[in-house]
Amino acid sequence: MPFIPHTEAEVRDMLAAIGAGSIDELFAEIPPDLRCGELKDLPEALSEMEVCKLMEERAAENRSALCFAGAGAYEHYIPAAVWEIALRGEFYSAYTPYQAEASQGSLQVFYEYQSMMAGLMAMDVSNASLYDGASALGEAILMALRTNPESRSRKILLPRSLNPVYKRVVRTLTRNQRVELVDLDYDRSLGRIAENALETFEGGEFAAVVIPQPNHFGVLEEVDVLADWAHRHGARSIAVVNPTAMALLKPPGEWGEHGADLACGEGQPLGIPLSAGGPYFGFLCSRQDFVHQLPGRLVGRTVDVDGREGFTLTLQPREQHIRRGKATSNICTNQGLMVTAATLYMALMGPKGLRNVAAACHANASALLERLTRIDGVEPVFPAPFFHEAAIRLPRAADRVLAGLAERGILGGHVLSADYPELGDALLICATETRGPEDMDRYAAALAEVLEC
């Protein structure tokens, strides 16, 4: 069953219309050394039935594993209703329409999302989402520079305890923006930003300070101290947070005396399944004073000429919609389907449900850490408060231990030594509400067995 729509006669007619004698002539401008030539090793085409059979055979090779890995993407239970509704034809589309007001249902969902996210973060306003948590931080940094004209600095204080992947993305996004990223070290004994490290910097030296909560080690930062330090020194405070944790911890809008200026992060924990790194979505919230500098889009509620309530794109300061020089971002669209799922997840869970999930995550992670550190040679790296991740030190090479656990059907965590060689054979472990006592016992037994090999 071929699905190529054009007949040979139609192809000839199209070539004749543009004055080309053949397909090869059409692409003659491409230098020969750039052409791939014949694909001699390409197998014969398969029928739809044969393709389905092949995919089933390949899928049968997949191995499911018990997951104790986190480091930025987390396995949470997603109520069945979330994706049952999100995949309905009213929401499920290839692209958000350019005539956005024609899709009142989608706009209302985005509006409700903005309201929920702003409430969860205790901030004034939220945009309609960005690509992912890392790019959201990059946009937040650029936004902080735009909203801080009093500071002539282009320096951003970036903690080493921030997710290293986020740092790499931020470096890419700011490389040609005259932004200088300055490392802020962490306390080796506690795993959080070292207060004495702040004392080495002069007042007014930075345009913004990035504050992760929890940080990459799972440790809770002294957010009040950091936010107040930023404001005393004329810098914007940028919170990078786990949205699930904010149901239990103090939200960014309440940090210190004045609250954080911006809050961003990865929205994947809010109803988005793990899927080879994406698609996920990023969120970005700010003070009302900075609303005109928000990247992406902002949905607002209004009334039409007949007095009926409706929803519209109140702000869309992207370069496709306004003059390039006036645009605040080149973010092309938002992760509309992911935001729809997140809105449904938050609505179905409610404030109490989100708090219960967050509390269960913390309780399970605490139980996991206690269970694993009973094993000889395994110890916590940082004796500090954490949310649902913690670092443990192993008596053997962490990467080999992970490989041994994988052979036993367990994703044991994330090796930290690649980005933090000073920590030695440290492993970042995670437990969400989906991990029970039996899972932890299985992990502990497998870890003990691997360490004895």
From Swiss-Prot:
Its EC number is 1.4.4.2. It catalyses: N(6)-[(R)-lipoyl]-L-lysyl-[glycine-cleavage complex H protein] + glycine + H(+) = N(6)-[(R)-S(8)-aminomethyldihydrolipoyl]-L-lysyl-[glycine-cleavage complex H protein] + CO2. InterPro entries: GcvPA, GDC-P_N, GDC_P, PyrdxlP-dep_Trfase, PyrdxlP-dep_Trfase_major, PyrdxlP-dep_Trfase_small. The keyword Oxidoreductase applies. One of its GO terms (molecular function) is glycine dehydrogenase (decarboxylating) activity. Pfam families: GDC-P. It comes from the Bacteria. Keywords: Oxidoreductase. One of its GO terms (biological process) is nucleoside metabolic process. Coiled coil: none annotated. Belongs to the GcvP family. N-terminal subunit subfamily. HAMAP family: GcvPA. NCBIfam families: PRK00451.1. The glycine cleavage system is composed of four proteins: P, T, L and H. In this organism, the P 'protein' is a heterodimer of two subunits. The glycine cleavage system catalyzes the degradation of glycine. The P protein binds the alpha-amino group of glycine through its pyridoxal phosphate cofactor; CO(2) is released and the remaining methylamine moiety is then transferred to the lipoamide cofactor of the H protein. This is Probable glycine dehydrogenase (decarboxylating) subunit 1. It comes from Methylococcus capsulatus (strain ATCC 33009 / NCIMB 11132 / Bath). The lineage of its organism: Bacteria, Pseudomonadati, Pseudomonadota, Gammaproteobacteria, Methylococcales. The gene is gcvPA.
